[in-house]
Design a protein with these regions (language model features):
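Histidine-centered active-site loop/cap adjacent to the catalytic His
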Residues: 1-5, 242, 303, 321-330
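Loop/turn elements at helix/coil->beta-strand transitions in domains of secreted/extracellular proteins
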Residues: 80-81, 117-119, 144-149, 254-259, ...
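Conserved SGNH/GDSL esterase-like catalytic core that processes O-acyl groups on lipids
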Residues: 90-177
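Serine-dependent acyl-ester chemistry module
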Residues: 157-294, 307-315
């Protein structure tokens, strides 16, 4: 008797999981959102390391991430020149309040396009460094009819080893069959519910990350280390970098202009600053990266601007957190 019950339970479990995988409800469940309906849309994509304090969390469902964002609030207005910003944690605004981010600073300038449409900038940055992650987000963003895509990049996003970002892994086009099962999707489904529940305290407080005073401030004195990740001098080879991903992004953008920006960084002047620009980059690697980017931009007709030293080091309170004051972005 017990054996028959166990067997039936197992059969029902397998059948349910197979049906779940066949129906694949994650996409429409992600689009079923209270944001932009009951709660305002978030000004940046959901991401968080301390959900209970930040009223925010990291999840893998792109549909849910975009449904919670203000870009999904309504169809694109006829008088709007829509700009989307793609990039890493500095674009998203790590340790910056929403009104301090690059998108907010640009919106505060009340810019007008040449045809008199009002410029509206949307923050679609997402923490961590990966061109493939950025391209995945860009692909989804194209469904919201941007008139311009601004992609802020830095050398840390280019190594081959960074391309399999967790968001990319979770959104593969052909996952393993068992990865589609309900049993494998339990955490992701729970995260969809949690994102909706956090809408109440977020809408009430406006808090979407923990602004800790205990963060690592940028260092002006550096170690005498000339390595970049696993790479050593003297040569940074093209094969070390995922430059082809930019070509894929241009194809995704299609006729929409894509502006690639080598984002500003803090430049140290203290001990061993003749070896390294900062904690992340030895001079030899970063200099060669800039040369490679300029050459590729010229050869492949990229819209590219190099702002690597546009912001003084004093404007950075941590390595990835420049104060995006309008005097530098105007």
């Amino acid at each position: 008797m017990i054996r028959r019950i166990c067997l039936k339970t197992l059969v029902l479990f397998v059948v349910f999981n197979v049906l779940f995988a066949f129906i694949a409800p994650q996409s429409w469940l992600g689009r079923a959102s209270l944001y932009n309906l009951v709660f305002p849309g978030r000004p940046r994509l959901p991401w968080g390391e301390n959900p209970d304090r930040a009223y925010n969390l990291t999840l893998n469902n792109l549909d849910a991430m975009f449904a919670a964002h203000e870009i999904a609030a309504s169809p694109k207005p006829a008088d709007e020149f829509r700009v989307v910003l793609i990039g890493d944690s500095s674009t998203w605004g790590f340790l910056l309040r929403p009104e301090e981010t690059l998108s907010a600073q640009l919106n505060a300038m009340q810019l007008k396009a040449k045809d008199s449409r009002r410029v509206r900038v949307y923050n679609l940055g997402y923490p961590d460094f990966s061109l493939s992650k950025d391209t995945l987000i860009m692909q989804r963003a194209m469904g919201y009819q941007p008139d311009l895509v601004v992609w802020l990049v830095t050398l840390r996003s280019f190594p081959i080893s960074t391309q399999m970002h967790p968001l990319v892994q979770a959104n593969q086009t052909d996952p393993a069959p068992t990865d589609r099962w309900f049993w494998s999707q339990r955490r992701n489904l729970a995260d969809l519910l949690r994102l909706q529940l956090y809408g109440v305290p977020w809408a009430t407080t406006g808090i979407d990350q923990v602004y800790s005073a205990d963060y690592v401030r940028w260092q002006n004195d550096l170690d005498p280390d000339d390595t970049f990740q696993t790479l050593k001098p003297p040569t940074l080879n093209r094969a070390d970098l995922a430059l082809d991903v930019i070509g894929q992004a241009k194809q995704i953008a299609g006729t929409t202009p894509l502006l690639i920006v080598n984002e500003p960084m803090a430049i140290a002047t203290g001990k061993n600053s003749d070896i390294r620009y900062n904690f992340f980059y030895p001079r030899w690697a970063y200099d060669q990266y800039r040369v490679l980017m300029t050459e590729q931009a010229q050869q492949k007709n990229w819209r590219y601007v190099d702002l690597w030293n546009a912001i003084p080091a004093a404007e950075f309170f941590c390595w990835a957190c420049p104060v995006m004051s309008t005097r530098y972005w105007s």
